[in-house]
Amino acid sequence: ATCAYLETWHLDIEDFIDLRRNTGDERRRTHDMNTANWIPDLFMKRVIENRDWTLFSPDEVPELHHIYGKEFERKYAGYEENARKGLIKKYKSVPALKLWRKMLGRLFETGHPWITFKDPCNIRSPQDHAGVIHSSNLCTEITLNTSAEETAVCNLGSINLERHVIDGRLDEELLAATVKTAIRMLDNVIDINYYPTIEAQNSNFKHRPVGLGIMGLQDALFKLNLNFDSEEAVNASDRLMEVISY
């Protein structure tokens, strides 16, 4: 399975959005490849303000791929000014709202490209010292750094919450013990796993990424005698994840 991410300022973004359509030139379609938008906050600001958005060729704006946040906004505005002065040759201006509606339309029509946000993923990354995150993965549940020397891979596991509700209450001590064991086991996986490439091995050994999720939430809430859509269920879910996280 493959997933390609493209930033919203890329000159090919409009063609990229159409890659999964069932109509049009088949030579310009990729029906078996997943696609995702990698959207900077500045684009959403332009959508809200109903302003234009400028598309660039990456060879003329090489820094944009490797920066985010305020630095991205300053550099992007500078490139727009250069385009107006004629210093950049390959660019196109489009209404941001029109492009956003096209993104949503294709998502409704084909399920692609997915909507992911570059700035929140980087701002909240605990590995911002390791560089800029350029994409997520096939399921958009991990955000890790990649480079020519490192292919990001993650070791994942899940806890069955239903097994931690005993006699109508959440056994927090049992859940905490399960989390501790699961994290230890996932870390062991890093050392004994098979890696198809040296780049994947380099990434795993250097950063030791693990992801611990949950399953059985509905069953757990049922055993706690809570309606899934109730305020009490929301509070219980918060408490569950607080125990798991801390």
Stretches with model-predicted labels:
Residues T8, I183-I192, S203-N225:
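Core structural elements
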Residues L42, K102, G216-A220, A236:
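A general alpha-helix detector
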Residues D167-A176, N225-S230:
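Structural helix-adjacent loops and short alpha-helical linkers that scaffold large soluble proteins
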Residues A1-E172, Y195-Q201:
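Active-site cavity-forming subdomains of large catalytic enzyme subunits
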Residues E172-K180, S203-G211, D238, E242:
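Amphipathic, non-membrane alpha-helical segments in soluble helical-bundle scaffolds
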Residues W100-L107, L156, V179-V189, L217:
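Short alpha-helical scaffolding segments that buttress acidic/His motifs in well-ordered protein cores
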Residues L226-Y246:
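Electropositive nucleic-acid-contacting surfaces
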Residues T2, V153, H207-I214, E242, ...:
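Short alpha-helical patches at coil-to-helix transitions and adjacent helical residues
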